[in-house]
Design a protein with these regions (language model features):
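Conserved nucleotide-sugar donor-binding catalytic segment
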Residues: 129-224, 228-239, 245-248, 253
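Short, acidic, metal-binding catalytic loop of nucleotide-sugar glycosyltransferases
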Residues: 2-14
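Non-catalytic N-terminal targeting/anchoring module and adjacent flexible stem/linker
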Residues: 34, 90, 246-440
Length: 440
């Protein structure tokens, strides 16, 4: 709450805060009472019985003053950057046709002894600066979460959060609005910091993915609604919706969400995969392949799309140049490591093939590292032990600039120019900038 009170836009003159207390058992109720006493003209608290986030938001919206232009949503521990509301107000004034605005989203992970800030993958939307996104033209600029989102109140009055849903009520409302409006604003020079207590993360994730309503009921209530609404307006499932469903559905196959077999009965597993297959029959394969996620996840999604239940996992055919994900690690002693994570299911590289780094001083071949155990999705082996996990190159402090490449018998393919000292300097600058924005 302090980050709202300290906003540069003028808290007393321009901002109303509604605190919805839906039976909280921690100290947040006492904190809210103190804030109401301190700012009685700007902060109001509503007490309701716990009925889920959708009901809490709907009741909160009933108490918004009619002279309010935009409504933003903020969880208790989350933080706005100092100029968030000022920049949102400016964008709204200069783009009166826009009914929804969103800022860059950052994870604020609290490990107890330290806090770490990480950018959401969808922050690539902001690389072109503040602008209006047309979802028919830029289908990868998806948006589905309520944290940090600002919605025009007059438009929001026409909608409501679905109180029958325990998950996804926010994305259902947002997607309905976007399919109607076809556009929204991205405001680049601010930040929304989403607090996560990493000491408690495990138990929270477990609880979330152990709820049966997260599976078949969610697919039918949310994804199926997207398909229906898109076809009703456009006569087809538009690329935006196809990519949105693909992007969100990948969560079912992440290693931390391993409760599919434990939570669902055999009949419920069959029903989930049957509905999943039906939904993805309306989604082209290319939207799954375009996801920025591990290839085994994509292969699992497409295997279910093709084969249904029971799971018959199929790997993609091997290609001439191995599919890789590139990443780097900096070491405290000035050394660095380059990694080419092999996305495909390969036991060996082709004969006379290798990854290497060429610097001013030498050319170094990468060391191939194989899996010591099976990689699983649910209980399905997607990469057996003995397949290649990564190709790793260790660089000394004077070797941090050069070219990273793959070479086989026929050709040499450059993967990236690297300047690791400069990259590290830029990374440190970005982190310091985010910390300053958080602590203002």
């Amino acid at each position: 709450m302090e980050s709202i009170i300290k906003q540069s836009y003028g808290f007393t003159e321009n901002i109303q805060i509604l605190l919805v207390n839906d039976g909280s058992t921690d100290k947040s109720g006492n904190i809210a009472d103190a804030l109401v006493r301190k700012h009685p003209k700007n902060i109001y608290q509503i007490h309701i019985k716990n009925g889920g986030p959708a009901r809490a938001r709907n009741i909160g919206l009933m108490h918004v003053r009619n002279d309010i232009d935009f409504v933003g949503f903020l969880d208790a521990d989350d933080v706005y950057s100092l100029h968030m509301i000022r920049e949102m107000a400016h964008f709204a004034e200069t783009h009166p046709q826009v009914n929804m605005m969103v800022p860059p989203f950052y994870y604020l992970d609290d490990w107890g002894t330290r806090k770490k800030i990480g950018a959401h993958k969808l922050n690539t939307r902001f690389e072109q600066g503040s602008r209006v996104v047309n979802i028919l033209e830029d289908y990868k600029a998806i948006h589905f979460y309520i944290g940090g989102t600002f919605l025009r109140f007059d438009r929001l009055k026409q909608l409501a959060f679905d109180e029958s849903l325990h998950f996804g009520e926010d994305q259902l409302l947002i997607t309905k609005l976007l399919l109607d409006d076809e556009a929204y604003g991205v405001v680049a020079n601010v930040g929304y910091f989403y607090y996560r207590d990493m000491k408690e993360k495990g138990s929270l994730v477990n609880k979330s993915w152990q709820d049966k309503s997260r599976y078949q009921p969610f697919l039918e209530a949310v994804y199926q609604t997207y398909l229906r609404d898109s076809k009703a307006k456009f006569g087809a499932v538009i690329p935006y919706v196809q990519y949105l469903i693909s992007y969100h559905a990948k969560l079912y196959f992440y290693k931390e969400h391993v409760y599919f077999r434990e939570v669902l009965t055999d009949e419920e597993q069959t029903a989930f995969v049957t509905v999943f297959q039906r939904i993805f029959s309306e989604i082209e394969e290319r939207y799954v392949w375009e996801l920025d996620t591990a290839q085994p996840v994509k292969e699992m999604m497409l295997s279910l799309r093709k084969n249904g239940w029971p799971v018959r996992f199929e790997t993609a055919p091997l290609v001439d140049i191995p599919a890789v994900t590139l990443h780097k690690k900096w070491r405290p002693n000035g050394h660095a490591e380059l990694f080419s994570d092999i996305e495909e299911s390969r036991v060996t590289l082709p004969e006379k093939s290798f990854f290497a780094a060429k610097t001013l001083f030498s050319t170094k071949k990468a060391v191939v590292v194989k899996r010591s155990e099976d990689q699983l999705i649910w209980d399905v082996v997607v990469r057996p032990a003995g397949t290649i996990r990564t190709a790793k190159i260790r660089l000394r402090p004077w070797e941090l600039r050069g070219k990273w490449f793959y070479q086989n018998e026929n050709r040499k393919v450059e993967l990236e120019h690297f300047r690791l000292t400069a990259e590290l300097r830029q990374r440190v600058k970005r982190r310091l900038k985010l910390k300053r924005a958080l602590n203002q």
